[in-house]
Amino acid sequence: MDMENNLQDLKKKFNDIERNLENPTNLSQKEFITLSKEYSELRPIIKIIDEYNTLKEEISDLEEIMKDENSEGDIKELAKEEFFEKHKVLLPKIKAKLKLALLPKDEDDSRNAILEIRAGTGGEEAALFAAMLFRMYQKYAERRNWKFEPISISNTGIGGYKEASALINGTEVFARLKFESGVHRVQRVPETESSGRLHTSAATVAILPEVEEVDFKIEEKDLRIDVYRSSGPGGQSVNTTDSAVRVTHLPTGIVVIQQDEKSQHKNKAKALKVLRARLYEIERQKKEMERSTMRKSQIGSGDRSERIRTYNFPQSRITDHRINLTSHRLEQIIKEGELDEFIEALISRNEAERLAGES
């Protein structure tokens, strides 16, 4: 009965919001934006509620036909078959769909994301793998019509990336990419390997929700900002002005270096954006750890030390170890960014775990 009351309350809330938005003259701009956001979030849930209520009415009508002594035998039989289909098959499905829609949303899912990739163990091979992953996510962003804006790239000079970061803007970026955080491992024969021996190397991926200054404030007194001349591969100076910026967050010791832009002001803004995202993610992880004491997630917490996926080139195979999903479409995934098979499976597993945790 509680669920029925909740559905009625949601429906009433939605109708009230709809009425307010139809007469926006009484609303401030801030109120209008807030209500519009609520409306767009509630609309898909209301659609499922309407489907659920319609189905219940149809089931009730069929019950009446089955009970009616004046109904003909053939009509009763048809009603019985339809009742079974709707009551035993469709109703449980729509109830599950409704429960999922009513689960509390991750407030960060609608945010843009900052992608950070660092070469791990494996020397130059790891750096080449890091560059490959960076391009893979860039391709995936293109497939989804997201904007992919590189923030910083530290080249090795021969095609590899020691580390690289990018800001990804678009719809549900963090929601779809958040399970990519962790250690990605590659197994392949390097082009420089004359004996044909298989090498294993790794790169670390971090997906951070982008946060604006109004959402997460950093105290000026907690920052040390150093400026210096930017340098390229091998350490040679590539700029004649002090445009490179190093921002140190004193309480945590986190350091962000930004030197890709020629303007010191732009480098500082980018460095602060990355720092804000990293600090926000630390807070996020704390909250997630508190929640995970009640609900152990099988697909991982986004811990960057957790090995999540292996890319095996000789066998053209990619395996996600959290959900035991293997694909032999390595080339399409790496070169074309066809990641949806893994991303959809991870989202589905997470939803199933959340539903199980609520029951």
Curated annotation (Swiss-Prot):
Family of the protein in this entry: Belongs to the prokaryotic/mitochondrial release factor family.
Post-translational modification: Methylated by PrmC. Methylation increases the termination efficiency of RF1.
One of the record's GO molecular function terms: translation release factor activity, codon specific
Protein name, per record: Peptide chain release factor 1
HAMAP family documented for this protein: Rel_fac_1 (MF_00093)
Keyword tags: Cytoplasm, Methylation, Protein biosynthesis
GO cellular component: cytoplasm
Modified residues (N5-methylglutamine): Q236
Functional description taken from the UniProt entry: Peptide chain release factor 1 directs the termination of translation in response to the peptide chain termination codons UAG and UAA.
Alphabetized InterPro entries for the sequence: PCRF, Pep_chain_release_fac_I, Pep_chain_release_fac_I_sf, Prokaryotic/Mito_RF, RF-1
SMART domains: PCRF
Organism: Wolbachia pipientis wMel
Disordered, as annotated region: 286-305
Gene3D superfamilies assigned to the protein according to its UniProt record, in alphabetical order: 3.30.160.20, 3.30.70.1660, 6.10.140.1950
Subcellular location: Cytoplasm
